[in-house]
Amino acid sequence: MNSSCCLSSVSPMLPNLSEHPAAPPASNRSGSGFCEQVFIKPEVFLALGIVSLMENILVILAVVRNGNLHSPMYFFLCSLAAADMLVSLSNSLETIMIAVINSDSLTLEDQFIQHMDNIFDSMICISLVASICNLLAIAIDRYVTIFYALRYHSIMTVRKALTLIGVIWVCCGICGVMFIIYSESKMVIVCLITMFFAMVLLMGTLYIHMFLFARLHVQRIAVLPPAGVVAPQQHSCMKGAVTITILLGVFIFCWAPFFLHLVLIITCPTNPYCICYTAHFNTYLVLIMCNSVIDPLIYAFRSLELRNTFKEILCGCNSMNLG
């Protein structure tokens, strides 16, 4: 990757994923100001990174401490929180490194800068793959909960969930190494784009199936006698599905501009309009970090148990039932 592309900026970016050819003359643009690289202060990245780290650490602590949250879905949420922490940590460290280099307080060799640049990019890519895989795992967990409710506890045990999480992170680590090895190849970008759209399509299919089933179930309940009510377990399952749907929607909203950026790099690297769009890369990076900040808020908003555990941890209460 071209470290000069990254470290000449005052805010972090993925070099290979953000670099684009020199912009055309102003006469060929829709507006020279619109095509200029967006400047975002390093403090913004650091603030988002710190807030995200604190929030996601709180999520993991809450699940670990509260025995009532020791279920496959919450362990998958912990893994998703770890992925959010990784992208925040990567961007924060890269921001600090860029600030140090720009201040001339340390003299670093180009080879070291290149190496660190690849590591930061690899961390973000690992976080992306881990987020996608964990969201897919949660979607499958909710699918099994709804369609195989009576067999759920034998199909999806805590041990199986933890094993799956371990496999996910091992695969993500391998992907991270491959990203570094093939950092100069555009196939890395193609693989990321393909994985993103394939996973989104698969998860979308699962959720459409789940909500069509829920709609059919509600229609059947409506024709039953007054005694026929929705079982609490069924209501809980659908609530969990809604929560994960919200998470998926936020994920797509925050990451889609970044992936459009990648698509434009591949398909129209010299088009003036594409160049104008890719010039706003730092904005898309801020959106990615915002996703890491928003996710824990969704957990807290949708789960009373998790929200109460947050309060107990923040208040320093030690009367938690460890289950």
From Swiss-Prot:
Residues 64-75, 141-160, 211-245, 302-323 are cytoplasmic. It is a multi-pass membrane protein. It comes from the Eukaryota. It is found in: Cell membrane. GO terms for molecular function: melanocyte-stimulating hormone receptor activity; neuropeptide binding; peptide hormone binding. Residues 1-37, 101-118, 182-186, 269-277 are extracellular. The chain crosses the membrane at residues 38-63, 76-100, 119-140, 161-181, 187-210, 246-268, 278-301. Keywords: Biological rhythms, Cell membrane, G-protein coupled receptor, Glycoprotein, Lipoprotein, Membrane, Palmitate, Receptor, Transducer, Transmembrane, Transmembrane helix. Brain. A lipid is attached at residue 315 (S-palmitoyl cysteine). Coiled coil: none annotated. Glycans are attached at residues 2, 16, 28. This is Melanocortin receptor 3. It comes from Mus musculus (Mouse). The lineage of its organism: Eukaryota, Metazoa, Chordata, Craniata, Vertebrata.
